[in-house]
């Protein structure tokens, strides 16, 4: 990332966007893109972007906003007409967090802008880059993408800009205009479509079919009774407490017109009151019916669970029985094979070595058969053998040399206990320097006074010999 910061020019200008996803700091390149920065700053000062939505979200690509109509086709620049593109060699779409002008073609810039969510080389030399998102506010910018999007890249619950604040204005000559922001031309019906209505999925319920039938019946009755008075006889046909005979017979047509008018008003109020009562009563009946169906379905489900459980228990019993039978058959086969092998060994005429091996084998097999089975008795036997072995070791250690067992010539089970380890004595003996020995080493030092004296004497003798000659 360091090479990006080195390549990008320094910024001059800063704006703070307060959105529903959090604050977003934008630093501007007012020297590289003066027209786009002047347009953006003046629109922020004029509160042009207040309460506008981010109408387009493309995950991993861009988040677009700045249209007061919210349709993606509105928005005007401060110049009264679209202004030209401003490209710079040091500004490229090579990372996220860049702010650029949105347009429909070359030199068609208005008020709409977008944030980049990643590298977008295909936008180079097509859109004017005029700012960048700085600091930790880039994470608030990424939160703008955390919305549900339809097939047309429009968010169903879009984030919006609450207000704008210019922190540093590089253009001192900007004077905000008094303009009226265009109203949202989107019809109310289209706005309502953005929030889809929830549908009742009766298939998720165990009693879904009955609930769906009850719902259809309620809808059908409400449609048929719409616009006219309703009676409890129309809905509760199977209630024995209700009588089909009216409690008070209606007056005949010879009543006066004033009385008829008064009766109509009273009947209208009474119909409204009865309509509310009937709705509440119908809801209670449906709730009771659903509870009964739910309890019945739970019972049936419980019975159904018991049956498979009993079936699975039977299968487990059969598996255990089959396993026991297979194990018994295997043991029977092994015993038969052993008996057959014993017969063959007895029938064969073995030599001496084989006969000795068989005797040893029979001996150890007999000992193995004498051992008790696993349990407390086996444990007691093991402890007894261990204590016997300890006593043997103690006896071998405490024996005196007079009573020691002589070393056996032939190895047996107890011969190793009477064996004594003896090691070679490798201690160094002190040698006398005056004694000549085969291991004596001569040490000659020419600096030794004795050696010097010997050399002088030898030289003197050599000179005397030469003189004699």
Swiss-Prot record:
Residue ranges of coiled coil: 206-229, 309-371
Keywords in UniProt for this one? Acetylation, Coiled coil, Nucleus
Q: Name one GO cellular component term.
A: nucleus
- Annotated region (Disordered) at 175-415, 428-469
| GO molecular function ontology, one term from the record | peptidyl-prolyl cis-trans isomerase activity
Q: Where is the protein situated, by its record's location annotation?
A: Nucleus
The record's Pfam families line, in alphabetical order, gives: Pro_isomerase (PF00160)
Where is this protein primarily located?
nucleus
Compositional bias (Basic and acidic residues): 175-193, 231-241, 302-341, 356-368, 454-469
What is the deletion mutant like?
Knockout mice manifest significant embryonic lethality. Growth retardation, lack of neural tube closure, and absence of limb buds are observed at embryonic day 12.5. Surviving mice show growth retardation and retinal dystrophic changes.
Residue ranges of every copy of the PPIase cyclophilin-type domain listed in the record: 11-166
Spell out the Acidic residues composition-biased ranges: 256-278
In its UniProt record, which GO terms are filed under biological process?
protein folding
Query: Which intervals carry biased composition (Polar residues)?
Result: 384-403
- Name the SUPFAM superfamilies for this protein: Cyclophilin-like
Tell me the residues on which N-acetylserine occurs: 2
Q: What binding partners and quaternary form does the record give?
A: Part of the activated spliceosome B/catalytic step 1 spliceosome, one of the forms of the spliceosome which has a well-formed active site but still cannot catalyze the branching reaction and is composed at least of 52 proteins, the U2, U5 and U6 snRNAs and the pre-mRNA. Recruited during early steps of activated spliceosome B maturation, it is probably one of the first proteins released from this complex as he matures to the spliceosome C complex. Component of the minor spliceosome, which splices U12-type introns.
Similarity field? Belongs to the cyclophilin-type PPIase family.
Q: What does this protein do?
A: As part of the spliceosome, plays a role in pre-mRNA splicing. Probable inactive PPIase with no peptidyl-prolyl cis-trans isomerase activity. As a component of the minor spliceosome, involved in the splicing of U12-type introns in pre-mRNAs.
> What's the protein name?
Spliceosome-associated protein CWC27 homolog
- What species is given as this protein's source? Mus musculus
Write the gene name: Cwc27
């Amino acid at each position: 990332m360091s090479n990006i910061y080195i390549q990008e020019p320094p910024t001059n200008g800063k704006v703070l966007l307060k959105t529903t996803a959090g604050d977003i700091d934008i630093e501007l390149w007012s020297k590289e893109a003066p027209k786009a920065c002047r347009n953006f700053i003046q629109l922020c000062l004029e509160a042009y972007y207040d309460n506008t939505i981010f109408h387009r979200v493309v995950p991993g690509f861009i988040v677009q906003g700045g249209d007061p109509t919210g349709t993606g086709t509105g928005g005007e620049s401060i110049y009264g007409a679209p202004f030209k593109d401003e490209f710079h060699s040091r500004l490229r779409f090579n990372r996220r967090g860049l702010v650029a002008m949105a347009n429909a073609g070359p030199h068609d810039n208005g008020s709409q802008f977008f944030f980049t969510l990643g590298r977008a080389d295909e936008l180079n030399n097509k859109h004017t880059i005029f700012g960048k998102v700085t600091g930790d506010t880039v994470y608030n910018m990424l939160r703008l993408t955390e919305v549900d999007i339809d097939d047309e890249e429009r968010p169903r619950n879009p984030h919006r800009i609450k207000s704008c604040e210019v922190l540093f204005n590089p253009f001192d000559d900007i004077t905000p205009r008094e303009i009226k922001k265009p109203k949202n031309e989107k019809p109310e019906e289209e706005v309502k479509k953005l929030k889809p209505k929830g549908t009742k999925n009766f298939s998720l319920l165990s009693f879904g079919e009955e609930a769906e039938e009850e719902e259809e019946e309620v809808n059908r009755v409400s449609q048929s009774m719409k616009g006219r008075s309703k009676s409890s006889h129309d809905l509760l046909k199977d209630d024995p407490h209700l009588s089909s005979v009216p409690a008070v017979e209606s007056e005949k047509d010879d009543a006066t017109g004033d009385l008829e008018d008064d009766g109509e008003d009273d009947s209208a109020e009474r119909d409204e009151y009865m309509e509310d009562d009937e709705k509440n009563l119908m809801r209670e009946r449906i709730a009771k019916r659903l509870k009964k169906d739910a309890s019945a379905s739970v019972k049936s489900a419980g019975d159904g669970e018991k049956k498979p459980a009993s079936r699975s228990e039977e299968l487990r019993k059969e598996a255990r029985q089959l396993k026991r039978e297979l194990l018994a058959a295997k043991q029977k086969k092994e015993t038969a094979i052993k008996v057959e092998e014993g017969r063959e060994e007895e029938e064969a005429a073995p030599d001496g070595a084989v006969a000795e091996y068989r005797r040893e084998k029979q001996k150890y097999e007999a000992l193995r058969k004498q051992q008790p089975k696993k349990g407390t008795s086996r444990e007691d036997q093991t402890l007894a053998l261990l204590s016997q072995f300890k006593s043997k070791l103690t006896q071998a250690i405490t024996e005196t040399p007079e009573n020691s067992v002589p070393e056996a010539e032939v190895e047996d089970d107890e011969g190793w206990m009477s064996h004594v380890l003896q090691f070679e004595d490798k201690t160094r003996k002190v040698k006398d320097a005056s004694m000549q020995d085969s291991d004596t080493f001569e040490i000659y030092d020419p600096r030794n006074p004795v050696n010097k004296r010997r050399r002088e004497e030898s030289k003197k003798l050599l000179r005397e010999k030469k003189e004699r000659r």
